[in-house]
Amino acid sequence: MKKLIFVSTGRCGTKRIAQILRKYLPEEFAVVHQMPFSRLANVIGNLLFYLGPSDRVKRLLYKFIISSYCREKYFICSDPLTAMLIPKDFIDSADVCLVHIERSPEAFADSFFKLSRRRINSFIAHNFIPYWQIGIWPLENCISGRIKEKYVQVAKLKNKLFAEMYSASPNYVRIEMTEIFNSDFLSNLIFKFFNYEVIIPSNELKIKAN
């Protein structure tokens, strides 16, 4: 089963990517954005950053999370909450493509902060769930006057980690968020990796998911 996995810090257009691909690809493609247990995966992935990596934990949890989607021929995931948990056998596999999406750290920080103020679930996660984000401690989101600066550092750190962890993949791609939504990148990626031709109208790339 071929798998296309987008990894990112979040706030990188991954929800919109899933919406587009779900709309224009046939049913043999399982396209997911946020999966059950991915919030738990986010916390565990961040906790492993401090405790040290465990590929066994990553493999067991990640394969459990995606198991219900593996009935289709192809699997596409854009869930940023599972981005820290990709196991080594996925990284090394020629049947897995890892697309590392980057966004300007400053734009990420601004978007992330606004989301934490706009949605109650996001506010609760960012302020009351330990290890929800690397380097950010409970309540820091709402009491620190330098929180945006810290989110800038989070973005830089996570993108560095993703490059270190996943660049060994035979199908690793690193790309800016803006390029995805201003080019034929998605169509070309689907054709190159899955050998499936899909036409995505340019106007679809201009619509924001949230």
Predicted regions: what they are:
Residues 55-58, 78-79, 155-156:
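A conditional alpha-helix N-cap/helix-loop micro-motif detector
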Residues 81-199:
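PAPS-dependent sulfotransferase catalytic domain
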Residues 1, 71-73, 93-96:
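A general structural motif
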Residues 1-64, 69:
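PAPS-dependent sulfotransferase catalytic core
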Residues 6-8, 30-33, 75-78, 97-102, ...:
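A structural signal for short, well-ordered beta-strand segments and their strand-loop junctions
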